[in-house]
From Swiss-Prot:
Biological classification of the source: Bacteria, Pseudomonadati, Pseudomonadota, Alphaproteobacteria, Hyphomicrobiales
InterPro entries: Cell_div_FtsZ (IPR000158), Cell_div_FtsZ_CS (IPR020805), FtsZ/CetZ (IPR045061), FtsZ_C (IPR024757), Tub_FtsZ_C (IPR008280), Tubulin/FtsZ-like_C (IPR037103), Tubulin/FtsZ_2-layer-sand-dom (IPR018316), Tubulin/FtsZ_GTPase_sf (IPR036525)
Function noted in UniProt: Essential cell division protein that forms a contractile ring structure (Z ring) at the future cell division site. The regulation of the ring assembly controls the timing and the location of cell division. One of the functions of the FtsZ ring is to recruit other cell division proteins to the septum to produce a new cell wall between the dividing cells. Binds GTP and shows GTPase activity.
Keyword terms: Cell cycle, Cell division, Cytoplasm, GTP-binding, Nucleotide-binding, Septation
Descriptive protein name: Cell division protein FtsZ 2
Any Gene Ontology CC annotation: cytoplasm
Chain residue ranges for the region called Disordered: 320-346
Gene name for this UniProt entry: ftsZ2
Length: 346
């Protein structure tokens, strides 16, 4: 009689890497590390050796050491591009085994604008699902820097699977007279944190409805323009309020999720989260997009959220010609809707 042997099951989770390119990208991953984001690897890549030395990332790449001698790209994207080309083999060594890569950078300068598209293109060609999350300059930084940023964004849209843009100028929509300059940038960085965490949480955390990496890939691969949103609420009607907050878009440039081809909905709450609430939130998001959109919904438990309901949305494949904004919902009396500051972005 053949002896039955219990099969050995090896747990395999997708490897997700966030690479911060240039000064802006480096600051973004420093904030994510400080927030203790779990389930991802971090890489800092910069032409500026001094800035790189202050990075909190364990893995650091000096871009274009021979070209820049560690002195930066001097706000010249061509130098940033050449620096990334020089270091591309080292970059891909660090990305070995990665299934999904977030490339974050500030557009308008030299390193981020020039190097980020090179890195995104190489990662995508290697079969890595590649998502770029970048910022555009404030208006006071000048027209030339803005034009440089726009060219960088267009190059990224040719290189990455999905591109999300945060216009820094739109931070004025959610700032007040007491908002510090540092706080404003942390608001923008929080968007990246929310986007990455909502994806990793759906895959690795205990939940009512978990997703696998293939679900994420379906919504994000080759989808181009995208947006993210996160909302939180407590009290009565918290599911609907959180969904409405996730849909709201104070950081957008005349873009709506209405024309999205793919939508990833991440719903999280404490052990008091009900199936009815999950249905209510998911239904509200579904009402915001066209019927033909590919919608993937996941719901997870987070014991730290007892009493709080959170909804995160990633909408991809947005048609820029469909720019009509949905009407913002009116506030409801006696209820608390506390959306995280960096709720939504283009």
């Amino acid at each position: 009689m053949t002896e039955y042997k219990k099969p050995i099951i090896t747990e395999m989770r997708p490897k997700i890497t966030v690479i911060g390119v240039g000064g802006g990208g480096g600051n973004a991953i420093n904030n994510m590390i400080a927030e203790n984001l779990q389930g991802v690897d971090f890489i800092a890549a910069n032409t500026d050796a001094q800035a790189l030395a202050t990075s909190k990332a364990e893995r650091r790449i000096q871009l274009g050491a021979a070209i820049t001698e560690g002195l930066g790209a001097g706000s010249v994207p061509d130098i940033g591009n050449a620096a990334a080309q020089e270091s591309i083999d080292e970059i891909m060594d660090h990305l070995g085994g990665t299934h999904m890569c977030f490339v974050t950078a500030g557009m308008g300068g030299g390193t981020g604008t020039g190097a980020a598209p090179v890195i995104a293109e190489a990662a995508r060609r290697a079969g890595i699902l590649t998502v770029a999350v970048v910022t555009k300059p404030f208006s006071f930084e000048g027209q030339r820097r803005m034009q440089t940023a726009e060219l960088g964004v267009e190059r990224l849209r040719e290189s990455a699977d999905t591109v999300i843009v945060i216009p820094n100028q739109n931070l004025f929509r959610i700032a007040d007279a007491k908002t510090t300059f540092a706080d404003a940038f942390m608001i923008a960085d929080r968007v990246l944190y929310s986007g990455v965490s909502c994806i990793t949480d759906l895959i690795v955390k205990e939940g009512l409805m978990n997703l696998d990496f293939a679900d994420v890939k379906t919504v994000m691969k080759g989808m181009g323009r995208a947006m993210m949103g996160t909302g939180e609420a407590t009290g009565e009607n918290r599911a609907m309020l959180a969904a409405e907050a996730a849909i709201a878009n104070p950081l957008l440039d005349e873009v709506s999720m209405r024309g999205a081809k793919g939508v990833l909905v991440s719903i999280s709450g404490g052990m008091d989260m009900t199936l009815f609430e999950v249905d209510e939130a998911a239904t509200r998001i579904r009402e915001e997009v066209y019927d033909e959109a590919d919608i993937v919904v996941g719901a997870i438990f987070d014991r730290s959220l007892d009493g709080t309901f959170r909804v995160s949305v990633v909408a991809t494949g947005l048609d820029s010609n469909r720019s009509a904004q949905p009407t913002a919902p009116e506030a409801m009396n006696g209820q608390t809707a506390a959306a995280v500051p960096s709720r939504t972005l283009q």
